[in-house]
Amino acid sequence: MAVKTYQAGVTQYRQSYWQPDYVPLDTDILACFKITPQPGVDREEAAAAVAAESSCGTWTTVWTDLLTDLDYYKGRAYRLEDVPGDDTCYYAFIAYPIDLFEEGSVVNVFTSLVGNVFGFKAVRALRLEDLRFPIAYVKTCGGPPHGIQVERDRLNKYGRPMLGCTIKPKLGLSAKNYGRACYEALRGGLDFTKDDENINSQPFMRWRDRFDFVMEAVQKAEQETGERKGHYLNVTAPTPEEMYKRAEHAKEIGAPIIMHDYLAGGLCANAGLANWCRDNGILLHIHRAMHAVIDRNPHHGIHFRVLTKILRLSGGDHLHTGTVVGKLEGDRASTLGWIDLLRESFVPEDRSRGIFFDQDWGSMPGCFAVASGGIHVWHMPALVTIFGDDSVLQFGGGTLGHPWGNAAGAHANRVALEACVQARAEGRQLEKEGKDILTAAAAHSPELKIAMETWKEIKFEFEAVDQLAIANK
């Protein structure tokens, strides 16, 4: 066994952290970074620097390296790839030994992989494109409190996407008027109504008043329709203690589901709330407020597919994913990729959808994908095609903006959805025949007919800022 000796000084990162012959272990956490290096910094050195700074390295040699097995604990940059169509940056693949990270702590994973290294001067920009979590790590995480099948069984809703609605205006309503808006939408045919992400406990509507009036609305709508209903009560709060206080009250008044802003509220708070929901039989809806600050820049930040994986590990039964056809960012191929990462047990590498690694989730339950943001009845055929059954299609303005009111807007959406589900069962192509399908349904539904007339010219056709960088789309 060679004797280790200490030599003070500064060495190139590539001497220790660039290892092109390394074969990743099944237990390694793998990362794909998009690196834009500073001028004069070669690719291998920049990749090795990222591997070092995101694992156990620092800028100089230290004598305490002799007290550990650095070769075991270090991150290893093992492969570089060009980014198709962009010669200013490249992909670097880095492997991290599983023992670098606390079991079941996505907080700890992020502290290393997207911590100080993102301010490192050797790189001009840095983006975490994807992560592969080994099954050995997945098994240490709590995951969704309940998952898709448990939620369907509890609500007795099968064979179709579920319908939701974010109450508008998002701010300013009194608690009683807010509850009334919920009731009208639920009795009209929706499965859920929802707090907007920035509704917490403001002077115009304190959280306890909102919870009480909303649950009165939910229970009344259930009695009238004979269907299970719910409202996503946002328990996001200034402190964890206050968050749990709100969650406990939601449980006391019979709420089947609560809501959390997992990025703004924090991953630590989210994991704790997911555990509470699992223990108390409450479903957990997750909003992604703040994600675009992190993921929209194609050269710097964290891709949303990573945030999707982190949420599934941290815990949530629903996650907002964008719509493709609505007002929010997200191209179709990428969105289909992260929808699968939310729901499937195993997702293979697929560069055409931006997935860089195989991801095995084992027996971890999946999450409902939530489509929300600028959608209306004309989008229904595309939404059913893109998102499939295990999704929640949320029409805020597309419900409450109906000329005849909330109940009519909800009814229009329900008729449109059921028409699309029936047409799909008949083997029809929804996106090609969508207009005919909706027009036929509208002949028997004046609510749908008016909705189609109201929003027939409304489209959100903007090119995505963050596009897939693949050789053959």
UniProtKB/Swiss-Prot annotation:
InterPro entries: RuBisCO, RuBisCo_large_chain_AS, RuBisCO_lsu_C, RuBisCO_lsu_C_sf, RuBisCO_lsu_fd_N, RuBisCO_lsu_N_sf, RuBisCO_lsuI
Source species, domain of life: Bacteria
Catalyzed reactions per annotation: 2 (2R)-3-phosphoglycerate + 2 H(+) = D-ribulose 1,5-bisphosphate + CO2 + H2O; D-ribulose 1,5-bisphosphate + O2 = 2-phosphoglycolate + (2R)-3-phosphoglycerate + 2 H(+)
Cofactor(s) the protein needs: Mg(2+)
Cofactor note: Binds 1 Mg(2+) ion per subunit.
The keyword Lipoprotein is assigned to this record: no
Keyword hit for NADP: no
EC number, as in UniProt: 4.1.1.39
Alphabetized HAMAP family for the sequence: RuBisCO_L_type1
Similarity remark: Belongs to the RuBisCO large chain family. Type I subfamily.
Designated name of the protein: Ribulose bisphosphate carboxylase large chain 3
Gene name of the encoded protein: cbbL3
